[in-house]
Amino acid sequence: MYALLVFVERYSECKPVSESSSSTSLSAMGLPHGNKTSDVNSAAGSVPTTLAIASTSTILTTSQNVSGSTRLSLTQSQDFPTSTPVNCKKATESDTTPVVFVRRGPMDRNRGAGKDERNDLSVIKERVLNAVSDQSLSGYRSVTNKTGNSPKSMPNDLVTLTDVPDEYRTHLLWEYYKVDGDKVPRAEIAAMPLLSQESMLLDELLHCLTGIRESLLVPQKPIISAVGLAKYDTDFDIHTHLDRSLTHQVREILPLASYFMGVQKIIAATDGLGQVMNSLNEALQELTHDFYLIIVQAEQELRHNRLTLQKLLYYLQPTMWVMHEVWSSLVIIQLSDSRDAEVLTYLHERIKRLEGNKDAQQLIIGLVRKAAKPYMRMLQMWIQKGVIVDRHREFLVVDNEVIHRDELPEHYSDDYWERRYTLRDEQIPSFLAKYSDKILRTGKYLNVIRQCGKRVMPTQEMNLEFDPTSERHVSVINDAYYFAARMLLDVLLTENDLMGHLQSVKRYLLLNQGDFTMQFMDACEDELTKNVDHVLPMTLENLLGLTLRISSARNDPYKDDLHCELLPYDLVTQMSKIMKKEENWQAQPRLDLSGLECFAFTYEVKWPCSLVLNHISISKYQMLFRQLFYCKHVERQLCKIWKENSIARQFEPQAASLYRAAFTLRQRMMNAIQNLEYYMMIEIIEPNWHIFIEKMKTVENVDNVLRLHQDFLDSCLKNCMLTESSHLNRSIFKLCKICLKYCEFIQITQRYFQDAELRSMVRDSADSSESEQESLHCPQIETPLDPTDTFSERVRRFDLEFTQLLISFLKQINSMAKKNTADCFMNLVHRINFNAFYTDQMDKMCVEDAIG
């Protein structure tokens, strides 16, 4: 329709053609001449293009009624731009000579129209609008004779559009386009015989089924406030003078016209809204074409007088059922504003609900298969090459292009794995939901392989298509996943020696290299006992390098990846921040800590091994290292005072008895610290490491490697009491602190032991009674630690404080063991309290807690 309006606005009309010429033109297009206009309209109902052709021919035919003064001529070379093919006749000496209109180029479309031609534009519009109306050819002649040839006698606004916005209207959307004008009264339908009524009704019904407005079947104006399915439903007013039997039958067929027009509206409204919708609309266009073929076949039957309403209803009944299913599905999609993957999900679920309706189910299966083609093409590119081609953001994987591996902070190189590619949940079709994680990992693997400088070459070509009746796409996804997983695993384990790096990390950060640990502590003890602000990192690095080259670690190929680090927080703070996944650690105020409390080893690892040994994993290793290293330092200090206190053997028996309490306390401290170290290193770390290594021998993909490695670290942290929920690490830290204070106290009082020894040697030559009296009082010399306390009193206080802390620690372990018997905490209790020395005191504390 719009093509015809553009045609008449830009160009003048052709010369008049005789009736025989017009008839010949219609015959040349395959339409029977000599029939009434409804036959032409019937042929036009088959496809909208045919309607445009027939209307143009009618324009040329009716031009013979115009007076000679208004006739216009065109040169033979004149051509016309149209959106649909246009055929007409050119007036020449011979009326039967056909005229062929050639499409003009864009630059020539505004040329060739004279001033006189533009003056008669209103006359041409009048003829076009009347030609496509429901008037017959003779009726149009009556109108022109009655109104005359003056363009001023015609109204300016003859056309009333439907409620569909112009931007939704396409050459396929007719939607009962209404043309108002002077109507030629038809014969009274009530006065016609029943067969004539049925024949006329059939003719108009076939037009109505394709969206052409007729007089007996008038579509009602859409209700603006309609909601739900009614928004895309069309009701019709049937002529009241029709026979009731015909009215009843036509009412059963008219819903098909409503379904068809609703489908056309949705096609027009969703055009260009993504690849999935475009592909679905293409499939619906094929369905529309098949529907037009059915109407054409019905028209052929009508021309041969072999069609009745009852037969038409019988023929169209299966089509109505199927079209209703298509219409209702599309309306629900449109009302819910579903797009892309949501459309595929709805149609896929709709298939399951149509188990009893095979025809409708097969049709929806065909629609889903075609609508999913662009989505499956994107999926194939992702799992085959790791590439995303998604202009409309329809795919389930999104590429966060802002995050690049080379631009990431040093501590977050593993974020390339975690953040570069992520799932878009709203774009996952239901039939891919179970495999979405596998799809994501497949493309990730391929991209990591490409980042390692290797070329991604699939072993075989794949053709990924979605078929709701089979699971072939699942096998294609699985094959692509296993190929990428095996290839990346080979890159990590073989080409980059991931296991060698893991062994090196365990050797240094979990104190598995015993001789290196002791030599390093001997070399760095003086430096680490300073305040952290006075410790020189360069000195530590030099001592580390020296120790690595004189110990058995000199043969380690990755020893140069080990470095020293001074952290601005203690172990408790680090543990809290790791468990809470905080990142801005440097924002906290600096604490007054010693170098020993802030020291940790760090391990420098390069891509792609940083996927496994990422910053969080190294931080967890550091937590284990710091607790083990601190306990090892406490053990060394206790051993040192044991050596220095050997001088007490030279004391007199009465004087030496005063030191027995100090020696006993030191031994109890040594027993607790050594058993704590043995528990963490031998009973926790080694068994878990052995399990981890055994599982790594059968691993199939990198995600399993990540999972196994994290399970190993988490299990070690939990059983080594380094989780925020247990608070046991605070008790361990307090125990170590009291042990170090005790060692410091013993070392400070060491000179008094030496004085006592010298005095005892001098007094051997003096009076024996005086010597005994002074030797008895010698250990009771006041110390600078506390002028009011004697040595034995200080030892007694240390004993009481240590015992209370240790019993509280054991009590906490007992409490946790009751809640979770699978933990290994009770082994530590049995080791420390091996002779039930602390049992009575623990029971006493439990009773006191229960009472008050």
Swiss-Prot record:
Q: What Gene3D superfamilies does its record include?
A: Gamma-tubulin complex, C-terminal domain
Gene Ontology MF terms in the entry: gamma-tubulin binding
Question: For this UniProt entry, what's an example GO CC term?
Answer: gamma-tubulin complex
Q: Where in the cell is it found?
A: Cytoplasm, Cytoskeleton, Microtubule organizing center, Centrosome; Cytoplasm, Cytoskeleton, Microtubule organizing center; Cytoplasm, Perinuclear region
One of its GO biological process terms is: cytoplasmic microtubule organization
The protein's UniProt keywords, in alphabetical order, are: Cytoplasm, Cytoskeleton, Microtubule, Phosphoprotein
Residues that the record marks as modified (Phosphoserine) are: 73
Q: Which family does it belong to?
A: Belongs to the TUBGCP family.
Q: How does it assemble?
A: Gamma-tubulin small complex (Gamma TuSC) is a heterotetrameric complex which contains two molecules of gamma-tubulin, and one molecule each of Dgrip84 and Dgrip91. The gamma-tubulin in this complex binds preferentially to GDP over GTP.
Which protein is depicted? Gamma-tubulin complex component 2 homolog
User: What organism is this sequence from?
Assistant: Drosophila melanogaster
Organism lineage: Eukaryota, Metazoa, Ecdysozoa, Arthropoda, Hexapoda
